[in-house]
């Protein structure tokens, strides 16, 4: 079983390619440990903090572990409609953070996420969710134009905006990646270059380098594995 540890944020600044190596090494060790302790089905580990809760079963109190989940949220998509966590019910999905005028890692990230979109396009069990961290500039119209430029005209890949504080909050405290203002960074913000894989129960099952082909190859392989798991 996985040890009771909080998922360390993957910290990638808006400078290609400055990474918090200690965080990456810790995460790799954590994943290696949990994978090694997984069951014979070789399921992906559930990442994040676990909380012990007491409940009554057959008249007896037992202690159970509750895994970290992505909570509900309320954002607006490139189509102008409200998007909540319910839109992702019974889906596995990949989440990331970006902004349309990003001068550094975002173009690499979107090139790689487009590969994921193309591979799983039309699969009703898969969605992609990209959060802008510059909502003042990235209006619904801007996001729609950006999505169209990538060849995205359906609802399988949603680009969402909302109050800046809500986006930063869900990034740092729910997906546990960096998303914040930083006037010393290009564009005035700093965010993670990670892609976060979330299962149908809203658990985080993997964190991947979204700026490299190798990282995204691993993501897509794990998505296939997670789809098989959810169908078994």
Description of each model-found segment:
Residues 144-192:
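Short, internal strand/loop/helix patches
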Residues 83-113, 129:
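Short active-site neighborhood of thiol/selenol oxidoreductases, capturing the structured segment around
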Residues 125-139, 155-165:
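Thiol-based oxidoreductase modules, predominantly thioredoxin-like and allied folds used
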Residues 70-71, 93, 192-194:
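Short loop/turn microsegments at loop-to-beta-strand junctions
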Residues 181-232:
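Thiol-/selenol-based redox modules, centered on thioredoxin-like
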């Amino acid at each position: 079983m996985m040890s009771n540890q909080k998922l360390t944020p993957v910290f990638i600044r808006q400078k290609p390619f400055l990474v918090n190596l200690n965080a990456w090494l810790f995460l790799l060790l954590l994943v290696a440990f949990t994978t090694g302790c997984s069951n014979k089905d070789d399921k992906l580990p559930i990442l994040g903090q676990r909380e012990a809760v007491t409940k009554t079963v057959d008249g007896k109190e037992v202690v159970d572990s509750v895994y970290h989940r992505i909570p509900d949220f309320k954002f607006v998509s490139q189509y102008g409609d409200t998007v909540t966590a319910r839109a992702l019910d019974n889906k596995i999905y990949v989440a990331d953070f970006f902004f349309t005028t990003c001068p550094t890692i975002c173009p690499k990230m979107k090139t790689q996420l487009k590969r994921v979109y193309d591979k799983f396009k039309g699969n009703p069990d898969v969605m992609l969710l990209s959060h802008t961290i510059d909502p003042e500039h990235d209006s619904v119209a801007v996001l729609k134009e950006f999505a169209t430029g990538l060849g995205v005209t359906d609802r399988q890949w949603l680009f969402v905006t909302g109050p800046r504080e809500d986006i930063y909050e869900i990034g740092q405290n729910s997906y546990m990646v960096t998303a914040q203002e930083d006037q010393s960074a290009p564009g005035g913000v700093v965010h993670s270059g990670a892609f976060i894989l979330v299962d149908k129960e809203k658990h985080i099952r993997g964190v991947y380098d979204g700026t490299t082909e190798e990282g995204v190859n691993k993501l897509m392989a794990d998505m296939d594995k997670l789809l098989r798991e959810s169908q078994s």
